[in-house]
């Protein structure tokens, strides 16, 4: 029988789920039994069950910053989710809750507070997301990735831990990655991903510039569910995937450059791998602007180049990729000087302290 029991939560996008997985090996070493609460049909269910972690589904309403008719009905879903979470927590009796944010986390955190179960949350981005803002009053500690984030957190709850990086991401195999893509030449490899849900804009721009890009690079393109273009299935040097999990460490090890959104979890993995990256953050029209702040921070440190969505026209993306290639050594040199490290150990220590305070 395990010494401790933890229930993790978080969902909506992979960025609210995969950091939880980064903690799992170390939690098991520390003798934690691990279970997970997510939404019934979110991306978290597939990711978590694939990793053989017991999963409980609850109802949850989306948290919106804009007017929508569903804003009138979703609070009732949240209340239902709190009731369902209370039932699960009463039965499971965890020692601590770890929340990675996303709208599914709010009912779980509130239920844990009602049951007086310690809650530790983690915020990846520079400014707290809406779910973590709502959850913060019910949390014992809120771990952050960026030092600048501490000023947004009240009552000395903030703890600077860094971003949890999955160990397997650092242990990919380049030869295996090239083999998966059937790349047999020595061209440099450009790895493109638009987040777990894909990016229509990035997909279109890459395909528009594909022939030019293929002169210099082989291309791995993670394009999102339902976004594989059948017109390019047999295009030499161009490999498309809807989404990858097990193959990701090998594909990232194989690549020389990355084009990506600027979610904090991902960019700290790119930094750990020392991969020169062109960051295309979600615009303020489609987000709260957190990715723009993340990308600006990395550009300022000299780790990445940045291209705003509004700047993408004509040949701008292609020219920016050529600049990325030209500045490869400079960017790698800057990343090698970085003091950033994985936050796994620091987060585990916060969880252990929370459990011991409870006991």
UniProtKB/Swiss-Prot annotation:
Membrane topology (UniProt): Peripheral membrane protein
Organism name: Clostridium beijerinckii (strain ATCC 51743 / NCIMB 8052) (Clostridium acetobutylicum)
Family membership: Belongs to the glycosyltransferase 28 family. MurG subfamily.
Superkingdom of origin organism: Bacteria
Subcellular localization, as worded in the UniProt entry: Cell membrane
Entry binding sites for UDP-N-acetyl-alpha-D-glucosamine: 13-15, 166, 196, 291
GO molecular function, one term: UDP-N-acetyl-D-glucosamine:N-acetylmuramoyl-L-alanyl-D-glutamyl-meso-2,6-diaminopimelyl-D-alanyl-D-alanine-diphosphoundecaprenol 4-beta-N-acetylglucosaminlytransferase activity
Any one GO biological process: cell wall organization
CC terms in the record's Gene Ontology section: plasma membrane
Catalytic activity field: di-trans,octa-cis-undecaprenyl diphospho-N-acetyl-alpha-D-muramoyl-L-alanyl-D-glutamyl-meso-2,6-diaminopimeloyl-D-alanyl-D-alanine + UDP-N-acetyl-alpha-D-glucosamine = di-trans,octa-cis-undecaprenyl diphospho-[N-acetyl-alpha-D-glucosaminyl-(1->4)]-N-acetyl-alpha-D-muramoyl-L-alanyl-D-glutamyl-meso-2,6-diaminopimeloyl-D-alanyl-D-alanine + UDP + H(+)
Main subcellular location of this protein, as a coarse class: membrane
InterPro entries from the UniProt entry: GlcNAc_MurG, Glyco_trans_28_C, GlycoTrans_28_N
UniProt EC number: 2.4.1.227
Membrane-spanning residues: none
Function: Cell wall formation. Catalyzes the transfer of a GlcNAc subunit on undecaprenyl-pyrophosphoryl-MurNAc-pentapeptide (lipid intermediate I) to form undecaprenyl-pyrophosphoryl-MurNAc-(pentapeptide)GlcNAc (lipid intermediate II).
Pathway(s): Cell wall biogenesis; peptidoglycan biosynthesis
Taxonomic lineage: Bacteria, Bacillati, Bacillota, Clostridia, Eubacteriales
Protein name per Swiss-Prot or TrEMBL: UDP-N-acetylglucosamine--N-acetylmuramyl-(pentapeptide) pyrophosphoryl-undecaprenol N-acetylglucosamine transferase
Top EC class for this record: transferase
Keyword Hydrolase: no
């Amino acid at each position: 029988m395990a010494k401790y029991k933890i229930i993790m939560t978080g969902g909506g996008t992979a960025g609210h789920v995969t950091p939880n997985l980064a903690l799992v090996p170390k939690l098991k070493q520390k003798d934690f039994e691990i279970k997970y609460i997510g939404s019934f049909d979110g991306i978290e269910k597939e990711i978590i069950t694939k990793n053989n972690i017991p999963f409980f589904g609850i109802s949850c309403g989306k948290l919106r910053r804009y007017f929508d008719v569903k804003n009138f009905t979703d609070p009732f879903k949240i209340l239902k989710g709190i009731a369902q979470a209370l039932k699960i927590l009463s039965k499971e009796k965890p020692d601590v809750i770890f929340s990675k944010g996303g709208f599914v986390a709010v009912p779980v955190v509130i239920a844990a507070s009602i049951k007086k179960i310690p809650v530790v949350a983690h915020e990846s981005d520079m400014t707290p997301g809406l779910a973590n803002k709502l959850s913060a009053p019910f949390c014992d500690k809120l771990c952050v990735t960026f030092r600048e984030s501490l000023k947004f957190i009240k009552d000395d709850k903030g703890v600077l831990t860094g971003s949890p990086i999955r160990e397997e991401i650092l242990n990919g195999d380049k030869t295996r990655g090239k083999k998966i893509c059937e790349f047999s030449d020595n061209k440099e490899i450009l790895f493109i991903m638009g987040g777990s849900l894909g990016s229509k804009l990035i997909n279109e721009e890459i395909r528009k510039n594909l022939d030019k890009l293929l002169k210099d690079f082989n291309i791995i393109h993670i394009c999102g569910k339902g976004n594989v273009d059948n017109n390019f299935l047999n295009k030499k040097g161009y490999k498309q995937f809807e989404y990858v999990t097990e193959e990701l460490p090998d594909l990232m090890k194989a690549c020389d450059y990355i084009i990506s959104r600027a979610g904090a979890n991902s960019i700290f993995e790119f930094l750990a791998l020392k991969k020169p990256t062109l960051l295309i953050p979600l615009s303020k029209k489609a987000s709260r602007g957190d990715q723009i702040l993340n990308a600006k921070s990395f550009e300022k440190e000299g780790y990445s180049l940045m291209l705003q969505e509004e700047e993408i026209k004509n040949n701008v993306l292609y020219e920016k990729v050529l600049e990325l290639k030209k500045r490869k050594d400079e960017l790698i040199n800057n990343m090698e000087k970085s003091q950033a490290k994985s936050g796994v150990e620091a987060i585990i220590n916060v969880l252990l302290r929370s459990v011991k305070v409870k006991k």
